[in-house]
Structure formats: C-alpha cells, structure tokens
C-alpha cells in the first residue's frame, strides 16, 4: 500500500477471538457512524446465541451465511408486539439471500455443518 494517499485507501486490522467452537472476528468498526462488519466460523453442532443488545446499544443486523448452513433463531423482545417472546427459526444455506434482524430481537444460530457467517451491525 505504499504510495497510496490515505484519503483514497485505508487499511484496517481485524480482531479475531478463537475458541473450541470456532472464531468470531470484528473485521471493521466505525464508532462514529455506529456500524461494524463481523464474521464468525462455527464448527458443526455449535449453537451461538441468544444475543440481544439493549438501548443505548441496540443494534440491527444484516446476516448472511457465506459457507455451510445454519438454523437461525429470532425472538422479538418488543413488548408492544403481538408476537412478543415467540421463537422463530428457519434454515439458511450458503449463497442465499441476506436477512435483516431488527434491533428489538434476540438472535442466535445453530451450525448444521461447519459454517462461515457474516453480519453487518448498525447501532441505534
């Protein structure tokens, strides 16, 4: 990257947390604009969740499985909703769409096979 002006290209270091289940990596965080790009790898039969961020750290997520497959779990935690506390689940495989998780939902997933999972988080 030598010779590139910093206002054209910037390099960011990621932070990876590894354990027996796989890893979680924070690839990019912009605290000023409250956005982060994260990635995880989970071995087959690993469950991650249920995670929820409460105000003032509430966040929405855009999620995508880039390799493998999961069963995704969502629980709405907004008490004004008719479906408050209901558990929703569905399977996501690689190369499928990107899914949106609202900020008032607990979220988790179960890796049906070794899975790489990417997500973009927006804090409110």
What are these regions (language model features)?
Residues 1-92, 115-124:
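Non-catalytic, conserved peripheral segments adjacent to functional cores
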Residues 91-113:
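Conserved metal-binding segment of the jelly-roll/cupin
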């Amino acid at each position: 990257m030598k010779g590139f002006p910093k206002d054209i290209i910037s390099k960011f270091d990621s932070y990876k947390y590894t354990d027996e289940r796989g890893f979680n990596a924070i690839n990019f965080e912009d605290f000023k604009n409250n956005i982060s790009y994260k990635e995880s790898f989970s071995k087959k039969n690993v469950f991650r969740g249920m995670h929820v961020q409460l105000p003032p750290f509430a966040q929405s997520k855009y999620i995508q499985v880039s390799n493998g497959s999961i069963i995704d779990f969502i629980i709405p935690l907004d008490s004004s909703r008719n479906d408050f506390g209901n558990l929703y689940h569905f399977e996501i495989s690689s190369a499928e769409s990107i899914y949106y998780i609202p900020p008032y939902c607990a979220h988790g997933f179960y890796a049906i096979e070794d899975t790489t999972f990417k997500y973009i988080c927006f804090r409110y």
